[in-house]
């Protein structure tokens, strides 16, 4: 599930 990771990284930044 790359979407979850991508979203988490985007929000983290």
Curated annotation (Swiss-Prot):
This is Protein YddY. Induction: Accumulates to high levels in stationary phase, barely detected during exponential growth (at protein level). The gene is yddY.
